[in-house]
């Protein structure tokens, strides 16, 4: 059997390539292309084509501010994008996207701040999360809650 298949170590380590942008510690992964296009126009941004996804960072910024990355479809591609932006410098990563709901009182367009996740997509089992539920960063959640409250936007919190 191939020794690489018997190891939990990565076979290929993502790294910064020639011409790749350096990113600051904060990044927003954006699932839907239309959302990425809208968010990237909120302020002047430089764009970097990565082949199957794009990266945006503030015009003229180097290693500071919020970067955007996307779009992507499915957990395997999301994992590849996340690994790449980590290699470029991202440390705190949030995801902006859509999801379905098993809660009958949630409606299309409701804002939900995830606290935990139920992972059933096939990629997460390859990450060492053990017996605990994957959970979000409480500090980042508080920042998001305050921002939404400041804007007067209603939201819910819960498991996704």
Regions found by a protein language model. Give the residues of each.
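Short catalytic/ligand-gating loop segments at beta-alpha or beta-beta junctions
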Residues: 154-160
């Amino acid at each position: 059997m191939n020794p690489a298949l018997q190891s939990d170590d990565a076979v290929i380590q993502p790294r910064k390539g020639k011409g790749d942008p350096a990113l600051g510690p904060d990044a927003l992964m954006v699932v839907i292309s239309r959302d990425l296009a809208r968010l990237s126009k909120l302020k002047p941004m430089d764009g970097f084509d990565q082949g199957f996804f794009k990266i945006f960072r503030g015009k003229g910024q180097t290693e500071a501010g919020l970067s955007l990355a996307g779009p992507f479809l499915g957990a395997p591609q999301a994992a590849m994008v996340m690994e790449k932006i980590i290699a470029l410098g991202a440390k705190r990563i949030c995801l902006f996207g859509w999801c379905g709901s098993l809660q009958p009182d949630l409606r299309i367009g409701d804002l939900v701040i995830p606290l935990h996740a139920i992972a059933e997509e096939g990629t997460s089992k390859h990450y060492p999360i053990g017996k605990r539920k994957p959970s979000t960063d409480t500090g980042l959640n508080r920042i998001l809650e305050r921002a939404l409250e400041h804007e007067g936007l209603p939201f819910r919190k819960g498991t996704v």
